[in-house]
Amino acid sequence: MITPGEYTLLLTDEVQRAIAANRGRDPLEVALDRNTPHARLVATQVKYLARAEAKLPSYAAAQCILPPLAFEQASSEACAAHKRIAGGAVLDLTCGLGADAFFLARRFRRVVTLERDQTLARIAAENFRRLGAANIEVVNTSAETYLAQPGLHFDWVYADPDRRSGDGRKLVRLEDCSPDILSLMPLIGRTSGRLCVKNSPLFDIGEALRLFPGARVEAVSLGDECKEVVIYADGTGPGITATALGRGSFTATPAQAGAPPHPGAFEPDRYRWLVVPDVALQKARLARLHLRGKADIWSENGYGFAAERPEGIIGRVFAIESIEPYDPRRLKRAFKGRGAELMKRDFPFAAEELARRLGVHAGNDVRLAFTKIGSGFWVVRLE
């Protein structure tokens, strides 16, 4: 975390010029450069501004101040921009670096965002100034203290609770995070009729619907990695959505999600296409429903198989060269020493263990997909 003294230094023209002059350099070289004032402080900013070019490009372009821990915990711009809420005024209970508040400010006329740490609150306010976000008010207080005030009214309350314990362990359960949203529900309920909560990508969709029965729950992925599970408790549900940013979304009710029948027996000779559902569909347990009528799939965590190339798929599609039972000895004879891309779903061995068993190394000579269907293990060679 940046100390109050370091924050004061970061505001000076001398340090700001040094940061600007050294962007693009190796941070280690900057830290050891005797000609750079406050070299270690400058090097840290150079390092995180470089990382922000991909994760938070607006922050990078404005040369915002980036505390390392707050940066690591911040939403990416792609995820922050996606939040499906809008209105007149929103209360953000968990400012942090402020990426979510910054993008909420584009959807709301007024944003009030809370930050318990005084220095981080000052940094967030300074960054909003640099970003030109004039409709955001940063309040240095806790969610518990602010919500205790009488007469509050907001169109939405937003929260991204801190999911790390005091000793650095990652937390998943909502009641273990800070602030404890569940214990604050009476105060939140009198402040707004709508609540949006960002959760860990490990958070269970079923648990979200149990805690908030009338909610919409969305699993969000970026680059085929599940980034967050978002609860929209506004009484418009229940509903489940899988969103792959840049690829598309698919929505169903909980009743629909549990409805798809399993295909019959696996007949490998029928199939010419392998479908890899996006991880958002897996997380939301909507893969089978999404592929219904387009591809056969036996498990929410498995692959889909199609005789004709399916269209409108949220995921990837590969042409199949062959499908055969998994026989590690035969595969080792065929591929030992070759470069291989190994994919797996619903398969008991990690990719590293498969590579060891088959005697292959990372490469693109061949692409193999491993899976389990029923009691059988299969390997799919892809074109």
Language-model segments: what does each one mean?
Residues M1-E383:
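SAM-dependent transferase fold signal centered on methyltransferase-like domains
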